[in-house]
Amino acid sequence: YRDLLGFKEVGRIFNGAAAALTSGRTHHELLLIQVGDAPGPAQGRRRGLYHIGIKVGNSLDELRSAKQELEQAGVTIEGMSDHTVSQSLYLRDPDGNEVEVYVDGDESVWKRDPAAVVSPIKPLYL
């Protein structure tokens, strides 16, 4: 989150086992807690956190740039989708949690038709 997505660590608690991170939009968006040998997330459909989404810009060029940076850092892009209202890349963080890196599409689409948020997902090619 810090090295590849630009989050800044703003502090630690629990004797250094938890770090608060911010993208600069608010006091913190993430609180990551080290839990030792805890099992990873369950596979497939499950209860709990599905994924987090992080907006990286406002254009497909910015999403392409993010994809290139992530791939150059050795991150595997597991999928890419066009959601009509946004375009997204999907990857896993080091703990196996799914992270969606996205840019918003034309806001007039969902403002004119709020149901566009649940439009069928289309493939995205970058």
Where do the language-model regions lie?
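An amphipathic, aromatic/His-enriched active-site/gating alpha helix that lines ligand/cofactor pockets
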Residues: K111-R112
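Short, solvent-exposed beta-strand edge segments and adjacent coil->beta transition regions
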Residues: R47-H51
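A short alpha/beta connector and helix-capping loop motif
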Residues: V117-V118
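Vicinal oxygen chelate
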Residues: I52-E98, V103-S108, I121-L126
